[in-house]
């Protein structure tokens, strides 16, 4: 865990070390506080990186990401802090039951889940709810004493494989130094944004273990809460880096298609393919329509309009190229309160992330393809309810 070198106490120790060579190992060389130059100063530059692709080639199990979109919404329109939001999420009974149904199903399938949250009180609530459904429910929280932590780990090692087990813990407890190879399913019940945390938590599942054929991450996305929606879009990058970008399965029972996480350099062909198959409608939501040259999808959308398929574009910030879209025959609606970024095709396929289909995208932008009509309709409801409730919305129409 050499990323700790940038802390004052560790740096002071290393300044006194007279070793000829200093070796550092870490899963997260980039720190959220930006102090990684101190790591490189004390340990030298990165000499070797083992990426997810090479690791997966040497392992016998698949990595699956299962996004779970919740129905949670705040009862007030006030802007809340992250702490206030997580408290509301942890106390929401419907949301907790939604998570529990997934965990119970995993236990019944013989899986060994790790349920992660950011709040100690939430650990206790979830553990209590799980007591009737597993032989062993282990709680691990950062506030435990060293003795309690040692006893908990000893207890884990003594549990036979024939007995069901679920671990409920805070992210800080299992973030580093926690090793229990039996784990194969992660439930990320609270929003996080930093990709380093995603990789760190996912790493808890990547230990070799006899009989392990796949590892799954259930990620709970509260798309009706703008901060949670934004944080999910940010952590998609972490999933790609951890090897979860190529094998994503839909939680919908009636869908067998495979979804993928795409980046800016590889999404267009697949997206245009979905557009070409559209029969009924296309709805696109972007923060801004701004381009110097016409985006490549304009021709695909023009073909749809020619065939009588309506195309609606929702825009958060107006004042750029909206009129060009209107002149092409698209309906353009501007709403400053819009938060979603997505494309919804035939109310059944969703492209959701932070890719702007009508603007510039950086190398960190990405998008997830989800074939699920329930999620599609949920996003339609969010988009159109926001539009209908906004008094100062503006629609662009062709001049007569």
Model-identified regions with their sequence ranges:
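Conserved Walker B
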Residues: 1-5, 172-174, 190-191, 205
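Post-DEXD/H (motif II) to motif III coupling segment of the RecA-like Helicase ATP-binding lobe
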Residues: 3-64, 239
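Conserved SF2 helicase motif VI
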Residues: 26-29, 193-217, 235-236
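C-terminal helicase lobe
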Residues: 74-77, 84, 209-254
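Conserved interdomain hinge at the start of the Helicase C-terminal
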Residues: 77-118, 124-129
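Conserved helicase ATPase core of P-loop NTP-dependent helicases/translocases
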Residues: 114, 124-125, 134-175
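A short beta-strand element within the Helicase C-terminal
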Residues: 167-168, 176-191, 200, 216-219, ...
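PLD/PLD-like phosphodiesterase catalytic module centered on the HKD motif
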Residues: 253-400
């Amino acid at each position: 865990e050499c990323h700790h070198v940038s802390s004052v106490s560790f740096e002071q120790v290393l300044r006194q070390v007279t070793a000829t060579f200093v070796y550092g190992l870490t899963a997260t060389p980039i720190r959220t506080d930006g102090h990684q130059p101190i790591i490189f100063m004390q340990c030298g530059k990165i000499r070797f990186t083992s990426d997810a692709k090479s690791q997966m080639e040497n392992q016998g199990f698949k990595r699956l990401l299962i996004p779970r979109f919740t129905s949670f919404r705040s009862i007030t329109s006030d802007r809340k802090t992250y702490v206030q939001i997580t408290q509301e999420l942890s106390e929401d009974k419907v949301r907790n039951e939604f998570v529990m149904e997934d965990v119970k199903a995993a236990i019944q399938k013989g899986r060994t889940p790790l349920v992660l949250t950011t709040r100690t009180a939430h650990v206790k609530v979830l553990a209590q709810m799980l007591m009737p459904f597993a032989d062993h429910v282990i709680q691990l929280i950062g506030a435990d004493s060293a003795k309690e932590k040692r006893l908990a780990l000893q207890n884990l090692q003594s549990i036979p494989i024939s007995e069901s087990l679920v671990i409920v813990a805070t992210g800080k407890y299992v973030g580093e130094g926690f090793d229990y190879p039996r784990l194969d399913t992660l439930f990320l019940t609270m929003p996080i944004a930093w990709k380093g945390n995603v990789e760190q938590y996912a790493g808890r599942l990547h230990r070799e273990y006899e009989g392990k054929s796949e590892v799954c991450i259930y990620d709970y996305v509260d798309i009706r809460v703008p901060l949670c929606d934004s944080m999910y879009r940010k952590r998609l990058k972490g999933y790609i880096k951890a090897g979860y970008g190529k094998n994503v399965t839909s939680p919908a029972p009636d869908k067998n298609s495979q979804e993928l996480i795409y980046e800016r350099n590889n999404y267009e062909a697949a997206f245009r393919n979905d557009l070409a198959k559209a029969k009924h409608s296309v709805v696109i939501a972007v923060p801004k329509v701004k381009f110097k040259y016409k985006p490549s999808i304009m021709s695909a959308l023009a073909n749809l309009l020619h065939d009588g398929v309506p195309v609606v574009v929702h825009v958060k910030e107006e004042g750029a190229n909206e009129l060009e879209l209107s002149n092409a025959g698209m309906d353009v609606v501007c709403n400053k309160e819009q938060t979603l970024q997505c494309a919804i095709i035939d109310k059944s396929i969703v492209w959701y992330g932070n890719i702007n289909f009508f603007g510039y995208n950086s190398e960190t932008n990405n998008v997830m393809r989800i074939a699920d009509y329930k999620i599609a309709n949920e996003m339609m409801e969010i988009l159109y309810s926001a539009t209908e409730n906004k008094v100062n919305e503006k629609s662009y129409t062709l001049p007569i």
